[in-house]
Structures are given as C-alpha cells and as structure tokens.
Amino acid sequence: MLSPAMISLPWRPDAAEYYFSPLSSQPWAMLLHSGFAEHAHNRFDIIVAQPRATLVTHGQLTTLREGETVSTSAADPLTLVHQQLAHCNLQPQPHPHLPFLGGALGLFGYDLGRRFEHLPARADADIELPDMAVGIYDWALIVDHQRREVSLFSYDDPQARLAWLEAQTAPVAATFTLTSAWRANMSREEYGEKFRQIQAYLHSGDCYQVNLAQRFTATYRGDEWQAFRQLNRANRAPFSAFIRLDEGAVLSLSPERFIQLRQGDIQTRPIKGTLPRLADPEQDALQQQKLANSPKDRAENLMIVDLMRNDIGRVAEPGSVRVPELFVVEPFPAVHHLVSTVTARLPAHLHAADLLRAAFPGGSITGAPKVRAMEIIDELEPQRRNAWCGSIGYLSFCGNMDSSITIRTLTAWQGHLYCSAGGGIVADSEEAAEYQETFDKVNRILHQLES
C-alpha cells in the first residue's frame, strides 16, 4: 500500500503548459489537459514522461519494453496492461483530491477494438501509429484548477524529479504551418452513396444507427505542440490531450468523457446530438432549445444510452446501472452537444481494465448494435480510424480510471495531419444535414490551423 511522496509547487493556471513545453518533443511525454474550459469537468491537467515501461500494440502483437528488456505477446492488450500494473506492486489508497497516482496512461486507438470483437479488414490501414500506446508512469505533475494547486508526486524522489523537470529546456522548434489545403477522403457524391447504403441497412432492420465519418488530410511542417497549444486555447475542450510517440503525435480536443471509475463508481457521458453555435445570443439560445427538443437527436442519444447501459452492465454490479441525466444540452465554443450520463458500480473483484474492455470502443462513435455498426463502418469508410474515436486516458495504481472519446482529434504522422468527423445516421436522418454536421464539428479546428 505504498503511497507516493508528494510536493507542492507554486500555483499558476498555465502550469501544465509551462512544465510540459520543454518535454513536448520527448517520445512518451503525455499531457491530459482540461482545456482551460468553463465546464464542470474542467479540473485536472496531468503531465507524465519517462515511463518505467511501455506497451505498444500493432495488430495481434504487443511489445513490452522495461529498461533494456523487450518482449512480445499475443495476449489481450488490456490484460497485459493489468498485469504490468500488478507487476509494479504499487497499490496506494485513493487520494482525496488527486485522481491519478501513477499507473498506465496513453492511447487506446479505435482499432484496438479489433482485439475484442471479430471484425472484417476491408478499410485501408494507412497510418502506422499503434493500436495501443501506453506507458507505465511512477510520477506525475497534476494541476488542480478547482483547488488552485500544483502537485508533483513520485514513488522515488519527487525533489529529484522536480530538479529534472526544471533542467529541461525546450528545443528550438520550427514554426508549425500547413503546407497544403485540407482534402477529404470522399466526395460529396461518395458520401451520399454511403449514406444511402446505411439507410438501406437501417430500413431492412439490420441496425438502428451507424456513425459515418469522412477524413480530412493536409501536409504540414514544424512543431505539433505549437499547433496543439493554439487549438487548445481556442477550443477549451475538457478532455484535451497531447501525446508524443516515436512514430508521431496525437492532438486531441475532445469534449467527451468515455468512462470514469472512481472508488468503484462508474460514469460514462455519451454525446449524441449536435448543432452549431450562433453568434447572436438570442439565436444561440433558440439553437439550444431546438437541440433539446429534437426528436431525431433524442432518439439517437437514447439508442447510445441503451448501448452504454448494456456494455457497462456486462461487468457492473447487478441492478446498479442508472441514468441520472438524460438529454442535457452542453455548449462548447463551436457547437452545442446533447449529453446523457450513465452510472453504475464495479464489483470489487474486477479491475478498470475489465470495464474498459467491456465497453470499448465507445458506442457514441459506432452506432447500434455496436458490432454490426462497426462492420458497416469498416465496409464504408475508406481508411481505418486509428487514433480517432478510440480513447485517451489512464488506469491508476489506486484503481481509478478516466478516459475520453478521441473525437475532435488530429493524428500527425510522417508530415501529414489527419482529422476526421462523423455523425450518427438513423432512419429519419437527412443526407444534407448529416454531411454538414461533419463540417460543423471540425471546421473551427481546420480553419484555425490554416491561419
């Protein structure tokens, strides 16, 4: 039950940026950021770097590196994460104010779901970022925006870690700039064909909802961290993240929690239903009411609430699944979202990894029934989703977990930047409106990088 040693650092609201900037070019440096958001879930920023071990999954194989030791395994990747956490033999009591006390933190890409469900392999796997990239970290710096505290903990020597942090200097980085226009991976006509194919599946009773996305690509040069800082300040998303890997980087501006686990309490907050913000306050308020009262958006949202109740119910204590919030409109800088909340209890004999596996990937970005929707996505979307629509988050030594759905997320790989956007299509969806929604969700991000 070893607890980490902890020191307090002077408060500054930009502490996460201040301490992470010099680390931002180091592989396995990762930042979970609450996006300076005026949002109920804007509380913690978490910085990690220099993991004691890493787990990287490509397809059927996971490579585990711990110091000089390298091994590979075809076992379930989340089982390997659980085993690696147990191997560290660090089981601190949960802290009253800090959610993360070291543990596994990183990326769980959408295509990791292929390890848990049998899916076809039609879509082109053209981005070679890992399906899972998770570090095991025995220290972290945490910024608590509610208590206005900056804490550094380590299971080794926090003063030595602070000295290391303060000795880091940011390399001189080339200014970030796009070197091409954004281009979509499907034309308007091709989107229409795919939309109508989904409608045929829906009307035949094959499925109830399918999330169809298009992907935008541009070339770039310069420092991805610069791009993230600009986007993060402009979009203020409560589940933002920056992940630096050997192969590339992931820049996430997600508004959506996937699953949180705190002392056995489970919470998931699926987003389904979107309308763009309007400049005129009165018109914007009407837009909120329109979304709140939209039968189509409420039906979409309810389908995913039922799906998440079912997924979480696979591992939750019987009778513990609840829906305390249904159809709440939350405003974000670019759009209004319709959000619901599902809660439950996790039995003491199960681990956060069991919960993550039971619900992965999140139903809000697949459709329902989930496996059939994922099959249709693989059939109709030209490329695999990779990091997009997976999760970024942590499984702490203390048993806690929190994770996002990686929407509004960019992948940087080999001089290319990829950004996808989709929407849930149901039987009464309108093709033109669904097509426009994909732009409403990411236009703000794409244009900010162009400028």
UniProtKB/Swiss-Prot annotation:
Keywords, ordered alphabetically: Folate biosynthesis, Magnesium, Transferase
Cofactors named for this entry: Mg(2+)
Active site: E256 (proton donor), K272 (n6-(4-deoxychorismate)-lysine intermediate)
One Pfam short name: Chorismate_bind
Keyword Mitochondrion in record: no
Gene3D superfamilies: Anthranilate synthase (3.60.120.10)
Xref: InterPro entries: ADC_synth_comp_1, ADC_synthase, Anth_synth_I-like, Anth_synth_I_N, Chorismate_C
GO molecular function, one term: 4-amino-4-deoxychorismate synthase activity
Superkingdom of the organism of origin: Bacteria
EC number(s) from the headed UniProt entry: 2.6.1.85
Binding of L-tryptophan, residues: S34, H41, N42, R43, F44, P238, F239, S240
Pathway: Cofactor biosynthesis; tetrahydrofolate biosynthesis; 4-aminobenzoate from chorismate: step 1/2
GO biological process, one term: tetrahydrofolate biosynthetic process
Top enzyme class: transferase
Catalyzed chemical reaction(s): chorismate + L-glutamine = 4-amino-4-deoxychorismate + L-glutamate
Role according to the record: Part of a heterodimeric complex that catalyzes the two-step biosynthesis of 4-amino-4-deoxychorismate (ADC), a precursor of p-aminobenzoate (PABA) and tetrahydrofolate. In the first step, a glutamine amidotransferase (PabA) generates ammonia as a substrate that, along with chorismate, is used in the second step, catalyzed by aminodeoxychorismate synthase (PabB) to produce ADC.
PANTHER family registered for this protein in UniProt: AMINOBENZOATE/ANTHRANILATE SYNTHASE, AMINODEOXYCHORISMATE SYNTHASE COMPONENT 1
Subunit field text: Monomer. Heterodimer consisting of two non-identical subunits: a glutamine amidotransferase subunit (PabA) and a aminodeoxychorismate synthase subunit (PabB).
Family as reported in the entry's similarity comment: Belongs to the anthranilate synthase component I family.
Protein name in UniProt: Aminodeoxychorismate synthase component 1
